């Protein structure tokens, strides 16, 4: 298993079996589609994220690009194991706050106010916690800030999702997955990760 650590990532609680991704990583997937998925009997869990990529920011006079990503209840719950310091609850419940993901050259700290440039408008977010890790990889030199959906909407004026992830019940069939695929707008990317996940499961367990 130690050798496999270098070649495969063990499944995390947030590992998706299906993903629906908007074109050009924009915020384009309507929230009603997520609600429809949640009501599907073969869907165990469905959750969305909104992304704003490489947003210009200034903190304490230092310029830096950041990715701003929204979490909902389940994703905040999973993040508890990765909290280095600060408060998840504040980021979850207080609009205008967020969590910074740790990086070695981190110039953004708890207590800092980050000024974001969103389409020429200046918006502020206060950092209330630090995470050791998150499921996403930002470009080199780009920071990652996690916030609530309410904060994301306030800062960006976007209310649709960039990606929706789906975890299925154990009795879901290929036919069920095909039916979900048929629900997805043809402009969106539909990603089926079940085969890769099952091979990882087989290696570890």
Predicted segments — roles?
Residues 2-204:
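Basic-flanked hydrophobic alpha-helices used for secretion and membrane insertion
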